[in-house]
């Protein structure tokens, strides 16, 4: 991770290695890290760096206040709407995109700031994370042969559902301490910025 610009503690680096190994197991479940911490701690950057490290396709969704399950199932294609083309006005949602991508290559799915979305989103994600599948109406889509690694970030705006917590590994991502901050900047330990 460090070679790609992410400076992690030794414990977090080990956890990321174990997380990568979990995706290689023969299992339908999708390995999931729930990264919690204050804004600016590097949670999203960790997920993006992991995707680069393993050479995976990155799928990203930014949650927003009152975001519902429909935003994970489909997405509005503005270009199709503007052209009044009904066939192209709706496109696959982020979960279906991740499942389809996993047929050809590994995927890193980043669900950023889940705590901003409505609580029912937590329950909606359960079958996807536990069984690697998504059911929309009468159609069921399943994970391909390649792994999907899921990173969920939270700034603790609301409680995350207990069932979702049980399907993910919770990790507190602290802001860099003084020594790590200086290392990131490439400065010596005795630099004056370390005393501010």
How would you describe each model-predicted region?
Residues 1-194:
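AAA+ P-loop NTPase catalytic core and its hallmark functional loops
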């Amino acid at each position: 991770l460090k070679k790609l610009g992410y400076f992690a503690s030794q414990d977090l680096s080990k956890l990321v290695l174990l997380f990568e190994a979990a995706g290689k197991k023969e299992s339908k479940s999708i390995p999931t890290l729930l990264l919690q911490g204050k804004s600016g701690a590097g949670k999203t950057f960790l997920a993006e760096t992991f995707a680069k490290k393993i050479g995976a396709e990155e799928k990203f969704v930014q949650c927003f206040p009152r975001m519902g399950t429909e935003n994970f199932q489909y997405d509005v294609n503005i270009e199709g709407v503007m052209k009044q083309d009904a066939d192209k006005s709706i496109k696959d949602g982020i979960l279906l995109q991740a499942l389809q991508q996993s047929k050809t290559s590994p995927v890193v799915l980043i669900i950023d700031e889940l705590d901003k979305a409505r609580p029912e989103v937590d329950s909606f994600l359960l079958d996807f994370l536990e069984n690697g599948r998504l059911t929309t109406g009468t159609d069921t889509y399943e994970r391909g042969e390649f792994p999907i690694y899921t990173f969920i970030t939270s700034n603790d705006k609301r409680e995350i559902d207990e069932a979702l917590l049980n399907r993910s590994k919770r990790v507190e991502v602290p802001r860099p301490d003084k020594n790590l901050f200086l290392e990131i900047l490439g400065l010596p330990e005795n630099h004056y910025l370390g005393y501010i």
